Amino acid sequence: MERSNRKTRIGRVVSDKMEKTIVVAVEGKVRHPLYGKTINRSKKFKVHDENNEARINDRVLIMETRPLSKDKRWRLVQIVEKAK
């Protein structure tokens, strides 16, 4: 699999309590199939953070990768915006 074809997401760090792992919540808007109302949905991903550089509330870019553990299939590419 080429790196250019891997999925990327931008999300917010919701937990950094694990060693070399962060939890990132990715927000998205979905239209309800029957009523048409726009609903906010979020999904949490466990992300590999090799250098423990991301902190809570940082906006980060993550990329799909090979399975690194039971739950981790994403890795940190860059920190888009640091938390204030």
UniProtKB/Swiss-Prot annotation:
Is Oxidoreductase given among the entry's keywords? no
What GO biological process terms does the UniProt entry carry, in alphabetical order? translation
Q: Which UniProt keywords apply?
A: Ribonucleoprotein, Ribosomal protein, RNA-binding, rRNA-binding
Q: Enumerate the Gene3D superfamilies for this protein.
A: Nucleic acid-binding proteins
Q: Which family does it belong to?
A: Belongs to the universal ribosomal protein uS17 family.
> Subunit notes for this chain?
Part of the 30S ribosomal subunit.
- What is the protein's given name? Small ribosomal subunit protein uS17
